Amino acid sequence: MLGRDILLMMKIVLISTYELGRQPFGVVSPAAWLRKAGHDVACLDLTRQSLDEEAVRAAELFAIYLPMHTATRLAAKLIPTLREMNDGAHLCCYGLYAPMNAGYLRGLGVGTILGGEFEAELVKFAQRLQGLKPLYSGGEMSDLKVRSTKRNGVEAQAKLDGASAAPGAAAVDVGDALAQVEIGNAGAQVEKEISLDRLAFLLPDRAGMPAIEKYAHLIVPGGGYRVVGSTEASRGCKHLCRHCPIVPVYDGVFRIVARDVVIADVRQQVAAGARHISFGDPDFFNGIRHALELIAEFHREFPDVTYDVTIKIEHLRKYEKELVALRETGCLFVISAVESVDDEILARLDKGHTRADFVHVARKFRELDMTLHPTFVAFTPWTTLEGYLDLLRVIVAEDLVENVAPVQLGIRLLIPEGSRLLELEEMCGLVGKFDAELLVYPWRNVDARVDRVSEAVQAIAADADQEKQSRSGAFARIWEAAHEAAGVAAPELQLGAGYAVPFLSEPWYCCAEPTRAQLVSIGAFAKKAEIAVRLERAGTADGFV
C-alpha cells in the first residue's frame, strides 16, 4: 500500500559561468527555492569546478545564470556542449542579461528566459514543465499509472510496472518502481520574462557549491589575506544611469532582501570560514534605512568580520553623515563607479554626479580614514587623449593610485541591447550595427590613438597582474604609455606617500566590455567545451576542467 501522493520531481542543474570571483548568489538563492519545492538540484560554478557530466546527462532542466556580459558570452560557448551531452533537457537562461539578449539566446536553443526577480518564476516554470501535480493517492501499487499533463498536444502516459528509461524522461522513485514521462518541448513561455514582484527571499542554499575559500579573497596590507563570503541585501536600482545594464530590466525599481535572511546567510558563511563579506548590491544605499539597520546588526553579531559595499558617488554625498556608520561597523572599503572625471561624459551617462562631487568624496574618505575604491569606464566614444591624461592626473592628485586596480584604467564602455545610451541622437553616428555574437553595439573612437592606448593599458594591466607588480608600478607604466601616445613628454610622476589598501583578489567590473584577459578566457572556455564533447563521444571524458 502507498499512503502518500506521488510527485514527479525535476532533476535541475543550475550553472554559473562568471560572477566576479564570488560564490554566485544568483545560483544559491534559486537553489533554495527549487529544493524547497522538492526538486533535485545540482549547482555548478564553472569558474571553480569541472562540468559534472553525470549531472549534465541526468538533467531534465538546465538553468544558466547570466548576471553580466562576460557570463553571457561564456554561456553561449557552453550551450552547444550541454546540447551535445544531453539534447533532451530543457534549457533556461535567467538573470539580468537573459531578457536583454532573449532573441540571441532563443536562437541558441534556449526555451525559457527569466529576468529581474526570477526565483518564483523559475519554480513556476519547473512545476509547469514537469506537470507537478499529485499523481497518486492510496490504493495498490499494481493499480498505479502515471498521468502527465499535455505538452505540445502530446499526452505521455507510462505504467510504473516495467517502464523503461529514455533520454529526456523524468522518473519518480516509488520503492523499486520508476515512472517515465517524456518532457519534450515546454511550449510557449507563460512565465514572466521580467518579473519585478516583491519576493519573500529564502535563506540561500549553498550546499554543493565549491568552498568559499576557493573564491576571491581579501588582500590586506602586509601581505595577509582573509577568506571572503558574499551576499546581497538588495537587487535592482532606483537610478537610471544610461550605460547601466540594470536599467533595461529594473527601470528604476529595487527590491530588498529581508534583514533576517541576509544575516542568516552571513552567519552560515562565517561558520564556513568567512572573515570578510562582500555585498553584491548594485547600490548599498538605495534603501538607506535598510542598509543602516543591517550593518548595525551585522556588527553586533559579527564584530570581528569586515565587509565591503558598492555605493554611488551621488549617494556618498547625499548620505555623507552616514559614512561614519560604515567605518564603525567594519566596512573596509567602498567601491564606487566614478566612470569619468569629464563632466560632459558624466552627463551623457546620466551618472548623477560631477567631477567635483568625486573629488569631494575622495577627500572626505581620506579625512575619515576610510578607503574608497573608484572604478572607471576610462574609454568611451567621447574620450580624448587629453581627457585620459586628465583622469590619470586626478588619480595622482587625489592620492588614489593604490586604490585603483590597473585594469580599471583600460575599461571600455559596453553598449548592450536595450542600453539607454541608444536614446542619445549622437549615438547613431558613433556605433555600428548590433553584433549578435559579441552582444554589443561596436564602437571605435574617432581618434585611433585612443583605442590603441586602451589596448596598451589592458596589456599592461594583464602583465602587471601576471607578474604581481605593484599598483604604483603598473600605474607608472600606464602614465608613460599614455603620454607617449599623446606625443608629449611624461612629467616626472610625483606620487604621494600613499598607503597600502585592502582589496579583493579579483577585480570588480561593471558596464564594461570584456578585457583582453577575459576574451582569452572565453576562447579557452569554448575550447574546453569542444574537447569535453569529443572525449565524451570517445567514451573517455573525465570532466570539464
Q: What do the PLM-derived regions correspond to, one by one?
A:
Residues 2-15, 35-36, 40-43, 55-61, ...:
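Radical SAM enzyme core and accessory elements
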Residues 4-263, 267, 271:
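Acidic, low-complexity intrinsically disordered segments
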Residues 14, 64, 93, 279-281, ...:
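Conserved beta-strand positions
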Residues 17, 46, 96, 282, ...:
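Cofactor-binding loop segments of dinucleotide-utilizing enzymes, especially the Rossmann-like FAD-
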Residues 26-27, 55, 74-78, 258, ...:
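Residues at alpha-helix caps and immediate loop-helix transition turns in enzyme cores, especially N-
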Residues 60, 111, 275, 332, ...:
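Short acidic/polar active-site loop segments enriched in Thr and Asp
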Residues 210-371:
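Radical SAM [4Fe-4S] cluster-binding motif and immediate context
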Residues 288, 299-480:
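A structural motif corresponding to the C-terminal lobe/cap of the Radical SAM core domain
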